[in-house]
Amino acid sequence: MSFIDSLNQLLFPTRCFGCAALGLSICSNCRCDWHPHYYKTHISQLNVHSAVPYSSTASRIILASKENGLKGADNLIINAIFHVLIKADFVNHNIRLVPIPSSPSARRRRGRSFIVDITKSVAQRSGLPLSDSLELTRRVRDQSGLDATARAHNMQGAFALKRGAYPRGDLILIDDVVTTGATLHEAARALRSAGFNPIAAVTACLAQPLR
């Protein structure tokens, strides 16, 4: 460990993302809430494969990654998504990973496109190619607090293919969490309407039941 790393550890000791206990990025108690398994759900014409049920621990991990860019939280999400790709037997097939894009305002605020960055790391680990093909075509509301009907209306027609994008082969959408499925449904619709083939989605978390 370098001097800088040692100093950082002294000034900013590792704490559990779930409960803030010192020592590990996720403690043994919170690991019960973030222990990748394999869950399969279905929305519209899309199978959704997920790793962990959404919980307060999962929420804190996602926020630590999404809003604070903490590498330890990134790694937990990357590991969960990679776990599902293995369990669903998507690795070693002619499949491309398509991340759900952040809005322009979120990219400016966070300094990155959260799921695009996560998917890049998943692609490197899995050997599956990344196809950053989608973009938001208009401003959408924050989905937290919206019910299923409001989320569907909020996301309707929100995605389109980027200019020049041509995501060949079978496509897997990647996102952090599926709640009602509105975002994944619209992303899949945008790909299908352009003649491409989204066959499934993979998320780190899923709400139970889908709301």
Name every feature range the model reports, one short phrase each:
Residues 1-211:
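Glycine-rich phosphate/pyrophosphate-handling loop used in enzymes and phosphotransfer proteins
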